[in-house]
Amino acid sequence: LSHSSAASDVYKRQASGFGQTGPLKELPAYDMVVQGMGGLMSVTGHPNSEPTRVGTSIGDITAGLFTAIGINAALYDRQKTGKGAFIDVSMLDCQIAILENAIARYLSKNEIPEPMGSRHPSIAPFEAFKTKDSFLIIAAGNDKLFKSLCEVLEIPNIANDEMYKTNSLRSQNIDKLKLIIEDKLQHKNTDEWIKVMENLKIPCGPIFNIKQAVENPQIKERNMIVKSFHKKIGEFKSAGNPINCLLYTSPSPR
């Protein structure tokens, strides 16, 4: 459907599995279907593992988000031009859109990405590392952060080592580097390492389960767990609105 298919002063929107055009336009879809067809499951999980679904309904959620963005863009355009629009959002298209890194690697290098666990394909160290008691996410996204990390781990010589002194070199030699890092991390618990790393502004964090995530003081401070009310079941708690507008409070959905 074209722009002119909408009335001159209104907009219409359609979010569907495969959109309003193309050979699949009449077919139904669920989140799981587009995760598979969009390539997302092919890069999720660990090497040689079975196809792995992302832990949330990302196919549904991204389609909703892109639809909301499209509606806002159409309203803004109507305000300026007086013209309406038809917004066509495909769940499958949204999966392609969010795989920007993987698709860029294929289109530019003819490289077909594979699952890498928690590892990043082009930044290192940028993954989960085992500590004395659990796992720790470390995201040393540039050379400066890597030098700070080496200071914390008391391996300053590694920062200037010919195998690790640049991000490109670290990515090439990440298996060896991970062994060095985890050897040092074994001496303290995750919480202890986080305190030290946060002092140097090294991006890091624990891996929480849902209970720990919900009870995180940061989440409570941000009003991300709210009380709601339903006429049949009464009061209940749910996830809040991540969009904070400082001019308004965030009321519970009713």
Region locations from a protein language model:
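Short acidic-hydrophobic surface loop/beta-edge motif
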Residues: E127-T131, V226-K231
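Single conserved hydrophobic/aromatic residue that forms the stacking wall/gate
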Residues: L1-A7, Y11, Y248-R254
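Flexible, small-/acidic-enriched active-site or ligand-binding loops
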Residues: I233-S250
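Active-site-adjacent "lid/gating" segments in soluble enzymes
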Residues: S8, R13-L136, A140
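Glycine-rich phosphate-binding loop and adjacent beta-alpha segment
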Residues: M32, K227-K231, E235-S238
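Conserved PLP cofactor-binding pocket of PLP-dependent enzymes
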Residues: E198-I219
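Short, surface-exposed loop/helix-turn segments at secondary-structure junctions
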Residues: Y106-P113, N216-H230
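Aromatic-enriched alpha-helical interface/lid elements that frame and gate functional surfaces
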Residues: P125-L200, C204, S250
